[in-house]
Amino acid sequence: YSVLSSRQRMCPMNKSDTECRELIKARGGVRTATDCWHYNRHQRAVRTMSRFEENGQMGHYPAAWDMEDFDRVIEHEDACPFYTLRGMAEEASLIFCPYNYLFDINVRRRMGLNIDGAAVIIDEGHNLEDVCRDGSSAELSLDEIGKYADDLAKNHGKINEQTTVLSRFFQSMSNFLEEQFRMNSSPDATVVTSNQVKALTEDVLKDFPDHLPAILEIVEELTTTKSNLLTPITAPAVGLAGDIAVILMLVRTCSTAYNVIFGRNMDISGDTCPGIAFQCMQPAVAFHEVARDARSIILTSGTLSPMTTFEAELGVKF
């Protein structure tokens, strides 16, 4: 078994996601020879942890381990706990993780969690509705969109053609917002409700000729086989392009489940600024993405009442 947590909580060097990815780039094509000593030793820790089960089967000591055991192994091997646990998860039969690792579609995609045929057990299931709504929603400031469009457009190198496509993707959203703000000088936000969302989404993307799946293909290639070519400037932009493409695909296919809000005074990550938000109003959107692939989903809670309301929100009968 394994436990998944965020890089922010577990990195022994207190590095951000971008700084970490920069440090663990392979040197000379050798994946175990990176600039992060702890990352280079995480496979040693994975092998050490596997001995708990092996030795337990021979009766030497219990096969189960707790976090104190794990901490001792990490300290002894001087390894990265984040990548050690991810390595252990690849062969694990049981994985513990936060809600959003499953029900935030982009977190699940980035973590590479495969839930085909899995039994998913949700503790404190009464929180699931809000988690599902948040996991299928997105918000962007106009400044953020413009910055990433510029960062990707200025990239020069072997991936210039691909980053240019992503830059046009951001620019399409920027053009839409700027056009709306020119036509409407009101400080009040515009709320587009479910029956109008599909037409609005096409309007947002009208200046972008490429299909959204093509965006995901580019992002997947840039973050895997070509990750060494990304820089601390382009990496966050590429990651966000993938996240937004996924949300827009959901908006297109489940348009009646969404409201789209844009305005000059949006609350984006605690700041008041021009921006746009794609708000999922139906938890069933994220829940079905998991339920479709999982073998079963078991919810436990002392407060799942009334059940009829909960079933209606998640779009399934228990």
Where are these regions (language model features)?
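A substrate-engagement module of RecA-like helicase motors
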Residues: 1-93, 103, 150, 157, ...
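Structured core elements
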Residues: 3, 121, 298-299
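Generic hydrophobic, helix-prone segments enriched in Leu/Val/Ile
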Residues: 20-30, 163-166, 170-173, 245-251
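Signature of the SF2 helicase/ATPase Hel1-core->accessory helical subdomain module
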Residues: 65, 75-94, 98-216, 302-316
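A contiguous, basic/glycine-rich beta-loop/short-helix subdomain that forms a polymer-engagement track
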Residues: 70-92, 103-112, 215-318
